[in-house]
């Protein structure tokens, strides 16, 4: 049930008006223990590790085959024969020409998984990881559950995506634990890397185009290729729900294409079940942090190349702290579909005939994608640094070390109360922990004479590679702060809603919360139609931390709650400020129509001027990630209209709706009870 008809959720009675009234309760999750796999690697020869006896446990229903057999199976499948026949009639191309095209697509796409390549990467990655990471921590209980799952049913691995390292990390870990290495969906960009592209292909990568452009034959070949590997139980299939690396450390909204494909064999009764395994990969320090800041500031992403990889060797002399890889419980697709989706519609048509996805099926795929992402988020590890940097950003440019330590420890308690997966070495003095993480991130902050100072200048020059150094540092800091928002977003939205609501009537606060959740649903992961539960979770966490009390009618702020609310509002304020500034830009936009590229360039110029003039201190607005998310939200809210013209999308501003949104975000007009999606 969605939130729009939920007034009865807030009418739970109590004779005592000061009593806390909540329908939501949440037990604190207990996570598995971590083991550092590098500890053993440091005492055993890398060559011995790479050449070890490797006999992985496999799926009980496996059909043994070579990579070339999979290609032949796809080429000769009923589905591809049917699609070729249909396209031949539509395009008047001969069947032989189309069949030749299928062979070319398969040659471009398919992996050539070989044990020799796996052993090479095991040797190389073991050396590299020991050089740049203190630890690579894995929950071995999760590995044991995965081991059982792989033998029972086809498995799909769904890791979070923050770094290029993610790509081969799971292959390295599964090889380490004698599990079958996965076949991995990779972008075509990697094929441009001489030798490396082929090495990746031999380590299990299969390549997909970023866009299929309505190419029916390509889609048919790609989906049949993935389904063939899944049906045969050839190897676990791995792909990233986010589709690309998150440059901002916030989980990106999911892509649904590959998830739809891997679900199909179950719905067509070709497999009894399929396990989906959410995997959370967390970094103390992200290898590409500076590169990401450049990209967010508008510098084009460097093309993947072998030369670029060789230039990146300098990172081998740096310390990136620890990596944490948490394997979540395998989730049965059969259980998810039980009572929710019927498989009978698939019985009405022969399996080889492609079917258009029904609305019900699309809704189900969407729900599963968001569920998997929320499970990933739940198991993402927070190191002390995101807490430290969140405090620093609210007290920039510098802070007394003792004050920073005190505030960070206060935030540590709040993070744990909110159920955050915080790894904090309690056996070490707190000041040493904070000092260690400042040193680890010495490119961003430094400790000078009891003052912790953000590095906002670069020697004699304020400009580096055409970018203002201060902007690079602050966007890098924002990336780490964003890790906190994964668990703080719901209580933060309640805090901002309280600030926006004159009087603290529960239903008015809820209306403001619903409005904010709707506006920012491209920035954060919310389960579709779960607004009430999200509101209750936010309120529950604020009650649990003794920030608020709830009566049947009102939300009351406690005496100690003001400090928590002030911090949460400060944590979320950059996003509200960004969207307000982008509304102001749109109202000044002189062009009647514009493309996304024109919008990004003009917004960058407009916001840079505001910051240079001191008219705003909101550096997050420089992020192309925020700018793109805001544009998507504005289209969804009817603030901007989007049309397709000559294979490109053009946008135009709805001025009254934009003005209204800007005023609502700035609390100039009340939200009102019917906070509908369209403004």
Curated annotation (Swiss-Prot):
Motif HXXXXD motif in this chain: 161-166
EC number(s) from the headed UniProt entry: 2.3.1.42
SMART domains named in the record: PlsC
Domain of life the protein comes from: Eukaryota
Keywords: Acetylation, Acyltransferase, Membrane, Peroxisome, Phosphoprotein, Transferase
GO biological process: cerebellum morphogenesis; ether lipid biosynthetic process; fatty acid metabolic process; glycerophospholipid metabolic process; membrane organization; paranodal junction assembly; phospholipid biosynthetic process; synapse assembly
Record-linked InterPro entries: DHAPAT, GPAT/DHAPAT, GPAT/DHAPAT_C, GPAT/DHAPAT_LPLAT, Plipid/glycerol_acylTrfase
Modified sites of kind Phosphoserine: 11
Pathway it works in: Membrane lipid metabolism; glycerophospholipid metabolism
Compartments, record wording: Peroxisome membrane
A Pfam family reported for this protein in Swiss-Prot or TrEMBL: Acyltransferase
Catalysed reaction, written as an equation: dihydroxyacetone phosphate + an acyl-CoA = a 1-acylglycerone 3-phosphate + CoA; dihydroxyacetone phosphate + hexadecanoyl-CoA = 1-hexadecanoylglycerone 3-phosphate + CoA
Described purpose of this protein according to its UniProt entry: Dihydroxyacetonephosphate acyltransferase catalyzing the first step in the biosynthesis of plasmalogens, a subset of phospholipids that differ from other glycerolipids by having an alkyl chain attached through a vinyl ether linkage at the sn-1 position of the glycerol backbone, and which unique physical properties have an impact on various aspects of cell signaling and membrane biology.
Subunit structure: Part of a heterotrimeric complex composed of GNPAT, AGPS and a modified form of GNPAT.
PANTHER family listed in its UniProt record: DIHYDROXYACETONE PHOSPHATE ACYLTRANSFERASE, GLYCEROL-3-PHOSPHATE ACYLTRANSFERASE
Protein name as catalogued: Dihydroxyacetone phosphate acyltransferase
Organism of provenance: Oryctolagus cuniculus
